[in-house]
From Swiss-Prot:
Its main location: cytoplasm. InterPro entries: ZapD (IPR009777), ZapD_C (IPR027462), ZapD_sf (IPR036268). This is Cell division protein ZapD. NCBIfam families: PRK05287.1-3. SUPFAM superfamilies: YacF-like (SSF160950). The keyword Cell cycle applies. Cell division factor that enhances FtsZ-ring assembly. Directly interacts with FtsZ and promotes bundling of FtsZ protofilaments, with a reduction in FtsZ GTPase activity.
Amino acid sequence: MNGLGMQKFEHPLNERTRIYLRIESLFRKLGHSADLTQPFEYQVFFSSLFNMLDILEQVQVKAELGKDLEKLRLQYRAWMDIEGVDQSALLSVLEQISQVHQNLMQTTRPGHSLKEDRFLSALKQRFFIPGGDCCFDLPALHHWLHLPLEVRCRNTHNWMAQLLSLSDALSLWLRLTRETARFEPQIARNGFMQSEMENANLLRLEIPIDQGVYPMISGHKSRFALRFMSFETNKNCEKDIEFTLAVC
C-alpha cells in the first residue's frame, strides 16, 4: 500500500494509563542501555533510571497497578463460564496475573532501595545540571566509568533487578490491555474524527508514513477526538486520512 510502512501511535485515556506508558518507555530505555555498549549509553541509563525514581516517588504505582491487576483477574475469571472460551489459555493468563500480582505486592515500594543507594543518590542530585556530568561535577561517576565493563554492567543489571516485579506486572497489564481490541480500518474525514466508547484505557493507531501526518488526540474513557496535522506545515490536515484504530 505504501513504500515507507506504518507508524504507530498510542494515546492514554486516563492519567493512570498515561503513567504506565511513561514507565514502560523508561523500562525500554533502561533495557536498551544497560549493557553500556556505546560510549554515552550511561547517560541514557541514568537519566531513565532517575526519571523512573521521580515518578515512583510521586505516584503510588504499586497500589494502582495492584488494583488494576485484580480487576483484570476478575474479568478473566468471569469468562470461565462462557461456552467456547479456550479454558487452558484462560487458566494460563489467570496464573500469570496471580503470579505477577503476588510478586508485586510482596515487594517494598518500588524504587525505595535504589533511592537509598549512596552512589545513585549522590549522582541524581547533580545529574540533570546542564553539562553537569563532567569529572569535576561528578568525580564518583568519573571513577565508575573507568571500572571494568563487566563491573558496570553488573551494577546496571542489579539496579534494574530491583524493579523487576514492577516491570513484569506492568508489562502484563499493558499486554493484556492492548490485546482487548483489534485494529479496524477508519477514515478521518477532512483529517478529523471523534467517537464515543465505554470505559476505554488506550487508543492505538496505525498510520501510513507516506501520508505525512501525525495525530493530535484528546479524550477520556468514554469519548475521544483526533485531528491529523501535516508534518510539513504543522497545520490541520484537510484531506481524508485512512488509518487503523484499536480502542482498548
